[in-house]
Each structure stands twice: as C-alpha cells, then as structure tokens.
Amino acid sequence: MTGPELKKLREDLGEAIGRELTVADMAKLCGLPDPVGATTIRKWEVSGPSGPVAELLRILAMASDRYPILEMFNVFERHDVPVKERPARQQAFREQMRGDVRRRIG
C-alpha cells in the first residue's frame, strides 16, 4: 500500500461509516499509541505503511464497497450459497466490517 492509497482508504472508510476519519482515528485502527500514532499515520500517508499494518488495512478496507472482499474472507461464492443470496450476505459482511471500524475508533 502506498501513501496516497492509505490517504484514499481513510477517505473511503470515512464515507463507508458515515463520518470523516481523522489521522488520529486511523492511528486507533492501526493500534498505534497516542500521541505518536497520528504523526506516524501522516508519515505513512506519504511513504506508505508496511508489514502487518498494511495487511490489517487491507482487511479493514473491506468495510468500503470500493474495495474487494479478500478471497480468504469470501465465503459467499461457494457452491452451497445460493446465487440470489450472495449480494445480501456480502452486504451484511460489509456492515459487520463497518461496525468493527466504528468500534475500534470508539
């Protein structure tokens, strides 16, 4: 994930949960401590995060309709899930992810 992609993700997650996310909110999502967390996010919005944080952000991105549901989480395309139920189940999953984002930022 690049810095501009992280900044776009912050905007997209904010849109998904219905409120703008600050850099402090993103720091909470990443588990970064105050007061250095927001500063770290600002740096990452230039250089990009790495390692486990980048993977965590890829997972949290699924809260937004603008990002795909990662294959390891996509249990909706299995043969035992009726095709006409898949969109509703995917939407319910995204709502669950949005709830997780809201819970993490408090």
Model-derived regions: residue spans:
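DNA major-groove recognition helix of helix-turn-helix/homeodomain DNA-binding modules
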Residues: 33, 46-71
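Short coil/turn linker and secondary-structure boundary residues
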Residues: 1-4, 21, 36, 49, ...
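Short alpha-helical DNA-recognition segment
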Residues: 17-40
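Key DNA-contacting residues within the recognition helix of helix-turn-helix
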Residues: 7, 27, 38-42, 57-58
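Residue-level detection of the helix-turn-helix DNA-binding "recognition helix"
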Residues: 11, 31, 42-47
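A short, Lys/Arg-rich alpha-helix, primarily the initiator
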Residues: 1-19
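Short, charged recognition helix plus adjacent turn
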Residues: 62-106
